[in-house]
């Protein structure tokens, strides 16, 4: 059979979720009005939705199964162009918020919670890993460091 790589931090093989259909133009039932789609993305972004949520809303309520087939670029790119979105890339921000949650939990009388202690270590490893990638891409300053005590300031 096919040799599958293991999942990160698990002893399981990775069996992927759903895969998108291979198409290179938007289906005829979909909304292909590029201006309207772009405006929707900007509006939803201003309303504070994450790019993942925006994609789901566009898919479920506005008949846009795939923004890239309509606009030729990603939702995150559109948001960045209209300078909406945080200082940090979204995936990294989500991990940082998760880390803050675990730190709060461990700090409020649960310092012996070993499973979550490990969860925090894993989350922080993922943050550092992403940070290295974003530094190489030039989306983070090269002197940026992950510091647990400064994390709250970064997230807010």
Model-derived features: positions:
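Short, Lys/Arg-enriched N-terminal segments with co-localized hydrophobic residues
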Residues: 1-4
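Compact, Lys/Arg-rich rRNA/RNP-binding cores from ribosome-related proteins
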Residues: 7-156
